[in-house]
From Swiss-Prot:
Protein family per UniProt: Belongs to the eukaryotic ribosomal protein eL20 family.
GO biological process: translation
One GO CC term on file: ribosome
Quaternary structure (record): Part of the 50S ribosomal subunit. Binds 23S rRNA.
One annotated GO molecular function: structural constituent of ribosome
InterPro entries tied to this protein: Ribosomal_eL20, Ribosomal_eL20_dom
Pfam families attached to this UniProt entry: Ribosomal_L18A
Protein name from the UniProt record: Large ribosomal subunit protein eL20
UniProt keyword annotation of rRNA-binding present: yes
Lineage: Archaea, Thermoproteota, Thermoprotei, Desulfurococcales, Desulfurococcaceae
ATP-binding as UniProt keyword: no
Gene3D superfamilies: 3.10.20.10
Amino acid sequence: MSEVKVYRVKGEMLISHDRYPEWRKFEVYVRALKREHALEKVYSDLGSRHKLRRKHIRIRSVEEVDPGEVEDLNIIRLASLERFVKTG
């Protein structure tokens, strides 16, 4: 089974594209098996949270990082799990 890695994704997103367009920077930590999966997760999350299309999101860099460098508490807690059991 593959090991889940932590990626830091940096980029810009276009906020309020119809009235006063403004490009804002973002930095997100994502857990994924591959770089491509991390990109898809970022596109999906930003698109659903901010109602953005993919053309309104510019990815500048995707880096694999050590779990010790992560600042997001949710990612830290997920990384510390040894196993995950889904019930129901």
